[in-house]
UniProtKB/Swiss-Prot annotation:
Belongs to the urease beta subunit family. Its EC number is 3.5.1.5. Pfam families: Urease_beta. GO terms for biological process: urea catabolic process. This is Urease subunit beta.
Length: 122
């Protein structure tokens, strides 16, 4: 074995198999680039990002761990989201949800909070 050497199995690696996914269109309405990381609760990303946040509740980008997607000012992109797994709780980022993303009451409360915090939402 050589230090740092990789032993790669044959075949494809599949991630997020049998998990709910959705595609949404997102536009950066701000004047600065915005980068969103792989495990960020997409519902709570930057308030200048305009998209249907209801569709993104309890979901993150369906990209490899440790990577990100960058949105330039005025840029519109379609991204694929995947549902959280495990306990499916979201905390922090913009302090909108801070709890269980499987409960409809939490979703409705969070959508109402978006309005008071001036988040873009289609």
């Amino acid at each position: 074995m050589i230090p740092g050497e990789y032993f790669i199995s044959k075949g494809d690696i599949e991630c997020n198999v049998d998990r709910k996914t959705t595609k949404i269109k997102v536009i950066n309405t701000g004047d600065r680039p915005i980068q969103v990381g792989s495990h960020c609760h997409f519902f709570e990303i930057n308030r200048m990002m305009s998209f249907d946040r209801s569709e993104a509740f309890g979901m993150r980008l369906n990209i490899a761990a440790g990577t990100a997607v960058r949105f330039e000012p005025g840029e519109e992109k379609e991204v694929e989201l995947v549902a959280f797994s495990g306990a499916r709780r979201a905390f922090g980022i913009n302090n909108i949800v801070n709890g269980d993303t499987t409960l409809e009451i939490n979703k409705q409360h969070s959508l109402a909070k978006l309005k008071t915090e001036n988040f873009k939402n289609k």
